[in-house]
């Protein structure tokens, strides 16, 4: 995630955005090109209100003050945060922090949104609601989504293609159905091959 978004630079290989090499680009240039991210631990402007957090992102993307305020209102309504608009970001519940991170990303009119473990710290009851947020980014805002997470249910529900890593190495890649049937994935998930049926059952609970 850090390498793709320009917070770190690779020792080898290259990063491309829609066929154009951007390996040497700093993070702010990648952001202007439409490649934005959310963070695992918020990175909110905690001294600002919820609305101001989104306005700042829109202003940074070139919107005027009035347009930024309107955009913030639209996005907070979309993500169910309108009632929290004037609250300090510092006192938001964890799930709402995640939504605010997505709202800030969308305020920049991105082409791609990268989400770093967005389900970390969420209660299981909050995951389906956040899955709807991810789908809205893709379907309503026409932005591609790259999502990294350990929550199998979220991954299976929202991803069209899945790339599974084990100890930093590619273990499998494919559609959710292909991953469900991959014995290497189920073995790595629990660490024992006899656990395959249990893992497949967990992966398919929501089907």
Describe the function of each predicted region.
Residues 1-207:
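Glycine-rich phosphate-binding loops of nucleotide-dependent enzymes
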